[in-house]
Amino acid sequence: VSRASRVGFCGAPVLLGIAALMLFPDLGNPAAIVFTFLNPVRSLVSIGAWLIALALAVFTIVAALLLLRVRCRCFRLLEFIGSIVAVGLMCYTGVLLASMNSVDFWNTPLLVVLFVISALSCGCGFLSAVAFCTQGSTRGFSCLRWVGVALCAIEAVSLVALLVGRWVYSEVSRQSCSMLLFGEWADVFWVGLVLCGIVVPLVLVCFE
């Protein structure tokens, strides 16, 4: 297993566990959480909860095998299952939001694309950050350099396509675009998403 893969495998259950804890308040009381798991195909929320649970289980087992240096014949099978579940996790939030027909701005498959690309980009960013903090450089993960550049570029194109598509889709979605670009959410959009999420990572990767 390569160094980059080892870091990714070991970091995945930790980050996913933190994300799962942040989602619990959205479900409300404990009874709602239990109900969600007891009805796995009742809604997209239930499917997402099961995806998170399965991913945590598989990722934790893989990380434990790597840390304990245990050779297991089913390791490749666990990798395959983990990859399938990971794809589901990347798509889940975008699919959930895009399925809400009552919100014109979200009702587009481009939202799924944007979430998937953003997830992949965050994964590359995590590996690079770990390399920089532990080695003072990301040269050990040089294979990810151009992958990171490509993902940032695709993310930017997808974001522009999403905004243009929503701008011409309806008056309501156009108002949502205006709120993001020029209104009350403009600071979060331009500083948080565009600058910190796309421009800064792209510059850091290019000048490393």
Task: Name every feature range the model reports, one short phrase each.
Residues 53, 58-207:
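Long, contiguous internal "core" modules enriched in hydrophobic/ aromatic residues
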